[in-house]
């Protein structure tokens, strides 16, 4: 007797269509289109999780550079001075200081001033 895939197929289709909620038109309703779109969206999600890290780092660099230029120095000189002075603050923290707590950023800048 031939084995049919009725229950298995139904479960698989339901799983894919459930994940495809929020897609437009046939990409939500039709299994094949939904599966194709789901593969593509998973690829985008994987790729962009990596890209997000790059984008945030460049945003932090821009913010630190803007704060440094307000105090007549450049980003690269400031980062070099931090390294020479042995200050271990990462770019995320420095950017947050530059945006929200300028006095703290200025104190860090003063502490590495001799290494500039």
From Swiss-Prot:
Signal peptide start and end residues: none
Keywords assigned: Ribonucleoprotein, Ribosomal protein, RNA-binding, rRNA-binding
Pfam families in UniProt: Ribosomal_L20
Biological processes, Gene Ontology terms: ribosomal large subunit assembly; translation
One Gene Ontology MF term: rRNA binding
Cellular component, GO annotation: ribonucleoprotein complex; ribosome
Record carries keyword Cytoplasm: no
PROSITE patterns linked: RIBOSOMAL_L20 (PS00937)
PANTHER family according to UniProt: 39S RIBOSOMAL PROTEIN L20
Entry's family note: Belongs to the bacterial ribosomal protein bL20 family.
HAMAP family found in the cross-reference section: Ribosomal_bL20
Known role: Binds directly to 23S ribosomal RNA and is necessary for the in vitro assembly process of the 50S ribosomal subunit. It is not involved in the protein synthesizing functions of that subunit.
Protein name: Large ribosomal subunit protein bL20
Name of encoding gene: rplT
């Amino acid at each position: 007797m031939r084995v049919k895939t009725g229950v298995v197929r139904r479960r698989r289709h339901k799983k894919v269509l459930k994940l495809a909620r929020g897609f437009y038109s046939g990409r939500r309703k039709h299994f094949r289109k939904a599966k194709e779109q789901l593969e593509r969206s998973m690829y985008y999600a994987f790729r962009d999780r990596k890209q997000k890290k790059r984008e945030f780092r460049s945003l932090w660099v821009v913010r630190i550079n803007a704060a440094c230029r307000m105090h007549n120095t450049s980003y690269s000189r400031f980062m070099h001075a931090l390294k020479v002075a042995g200050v271990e603050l990462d770019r995320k923290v420095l950017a947050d200081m530059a945006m929200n707590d300028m006095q703290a950023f200025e104190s860090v800048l003063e502490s590495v001033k001799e290494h500039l």
